[in-house]
């Protein structure tokens, strides 16, 4: 059974994908994650790591390697966030390069001992956007973006990272 979810809100939650293997013993895994700008990785409903660079740091792309121990089947989920300065959804406020924020994440997870690829980011993942801004892109060059830019916050279920969560209403991940 394979399913995955992403939630970008200016949080993007990539959520559960189950990966199955012939064993239920604990194994070591290595996740390589590239994110613009920040992420947290959840395995079987528990956070096993997060980006070492704070979300309040404006940086283009971060790369992290996270090692963890888990048992199959794996339920894999991510929360991903793009750096934003305010609810407007814009970056570089008040500068000539003020723009709509953009974010993304890609990853691969392998069994550490065998180097067997367990999961990789692709279009089979599901995603849910928690915070969308701006809803009116024409506000991008506004001198008052916190007033002129509209936004939408959508609640995310507290059990989104569990293997029993139903993600049928979530969209397919977008690949760029």
What are the roles of these predicted feature ranges?
Residues 13-20:
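C-terminal segment of classical bacterial N-terminal signal peptides
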Residues 22-29, 34, 75-176:
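Accessory carbohydrate-binding/adhesion or oligomerization-edge regions at the termini
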């Amino acid at each position: 059974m394979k399913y995955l979810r992403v939630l970008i809100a200016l949080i993007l939650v990539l959520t559960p994908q189950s990966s199955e293997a012939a064993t239920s013993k604990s194994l070591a895994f290595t996740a390589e994650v590239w994110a613009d700008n920040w992420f947290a990785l959840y395995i079987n409903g528990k956070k096993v790591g997060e980006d070492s660079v704070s979300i309040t740091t404006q940086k283009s792309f971060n790369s992290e390697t996270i090692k963890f121990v888990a048992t199959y089947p794996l339920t894999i989920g991510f929360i991903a966030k793009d750096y934003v300065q305010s609810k407007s959804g814009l970056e570089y406020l008040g500068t000539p390069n003020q723009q709509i924020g953009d974010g993304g994440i890609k990853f691969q997870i392998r069994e550490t001992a065998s180097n067997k690829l367990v999961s990789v980011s692709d279009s089979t993942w599901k995603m849910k956007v928690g915070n969308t801004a701006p809803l009116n892109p024409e506000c991008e060059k506004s001198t008052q973006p916190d007033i002129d830019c509209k936004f939408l916050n959508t609640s995310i279920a507290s059990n989104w990272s569990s293997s029993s969560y139903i993600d049928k209403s979530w969209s397919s991940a977008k690949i760029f």
